[in-house]
Design a protein with these regions (language model features):
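Active-site-adjacent helix/loop segment of glycosyltransferases
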Residues: 171
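Short amphipathic alpha-helical segments at helix boundaries and their inter-helical linkers
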Residues: 1-2, 124
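Cell-envelope/extracellular polymer assembly enzymes that use nucleotide-activated donors
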Residues: 117
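Acceptor/aglycone-binding surface of glycosyltransferases and processive sugar-polymer synthases
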Residues: 2-20, 25, 37-112, 139-149, ...
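A short, conserved beta-strand element in the Rossmann-like catalytic core
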Residues: 34
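Catalytic donor-sugar/metal-binding loop of nucleotide-sugar-dependent glycosyltransferases
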Residues: 86-87, 109-110, 120-137
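Residue-level "edge-of-site" marker
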Residues: 31, 59, 135
Length: 171
């Protein structure tokens, strides 16, 4: 059925196809014009160097601004650090590369959308996660679904998952 399965359903369909076709790398790339394809080669190279997930990060060498928009990113990064001891500078980045092990992880597990909270689970599975510095543009297309109500719901879901679900999932 090719019905609207929203972000995760569409993403998982891509991971399933990539697993079936034996792809080495999957690139997660937002369609709103923020991400530049010029970083894909560097991300793939990091997968080839043994990393399982490469995050295109705005904040490897740049400071994260203190804006209302970045408060959520800071909270999620802090929660991941508390639970895993690992520092993720840009956990909400939708610009990522995944190697074969993670392609399989995301293709087969309905409880594992490629969202910030599942980085906790990936660390527990001993997946290597690396961030590389990228520049992102302002949104060119579409509108964010994150209004005040949806932001509160999203942040609540992320915090519950990071603190109460991901640390206890069977690895």
């Amino acid at each position: 059925c090719f019905c609207n399965e929203e972000l995760f359903g569409a993403g998982q369909t891509g991971f399933k196809l990539a697993m079936k076709e034996d792809y080495d790398v999957v690139i997660q790339f937002d369609g709103d014009g923020q991400h530049s394809a010029k970083y894909i080669d560097a991300m793939v190279k990091e997968i080839e160097n043994g990393n399982d997930i490469v995050i295109g990060s705005r904040f490897v060498s740049e400071k994260k601004p203190f804006t209302a928009r970045m408060i959520g990113s800071r909270l999620i990064a802090g929660a991941i650090k508390i639970v895993t001891g690992k520092k993720v500078m840009d956990p909400t980045s939708g610009f990522r590369a995944y190697g074969k092990a993670c392609i399989k992880d995301y293709a087969l597990d309905m409880n594992n959308p490629p969202e910030p909270d599942t980085l906790v689970y990936m660390y527990r599975k001993n997946r290597k996660i690396k961030e590389i510095q990228v520049q992102m543009s302002e949104r060119e297309f579409g509108e964010s679904y994150l209004n005040l109500v949806n932001t509160i719901k999203y942040m609540s879901r992320m915090m519950v998952s990071i603190f109460l679900i991901q640390p206890f999932r069977k690895v």
